[in-house]
Amino acid sequence: MAEKDHTEEPVAFAVRINIYHAAQDDPKKNTALRLSRRGFARIVTKIKFLPKRAIVLNPFSEIALSPADRERVEQFGIVGLDCSWEHAQKVMGEHVRGTSRCLPILIAGNPVNFGKLTKLTTAEAIAATLYITGFQQEAKTMLDIFPWGHTFFELNQKLLDSYVTAKDSTDIVEMQKELLTVQKREPAKCIFE
């Protein structure tokens, strides 16, 4: 399937999305830059310019993202990190404004890390955040600009739909524990379908 044309008009998007971009990879393949070009997100290159109270997608956070974070997402938006894990650790070590949350277990649908747990692109991570916090249509609209966007939802639909039913971070953690317990007993394909 050919890549969708990125010359379309930028969209008006209900949720404010900021992305800390460290310029560490090929700009032509970078999902954060494509989100910015299409009007879904604002690129930030300095930590000090990130919003104060937004949900920050922090892979090192001890608190999982859950539907309980919807109000904060709606009011203050989302901050995604577009950098290597090593750089993210350094960035998160600095004083980052906002409320840190880690994403629950999900499967990458992008062609680079297809099928790998937790190896999501910035766009996939933000779309997952939108979906889990109740902005399902916005999540699908966002990933629709990528030829592989539908694949992310096909791989993760069961997981995302279960995460949406969680009350809070504790429920998400329990769901993940159950998932990992089942995964030890059954082939991964059976669990994620």
Annotated model-derived regions:
Residues 1-75, 84-87, 93, 100, ...:
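N-terminal, charge-rich interaction modules
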Residues 94-178, 188:
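C-terminal folded domains that constitute the principal catalytic or ligand-binding module
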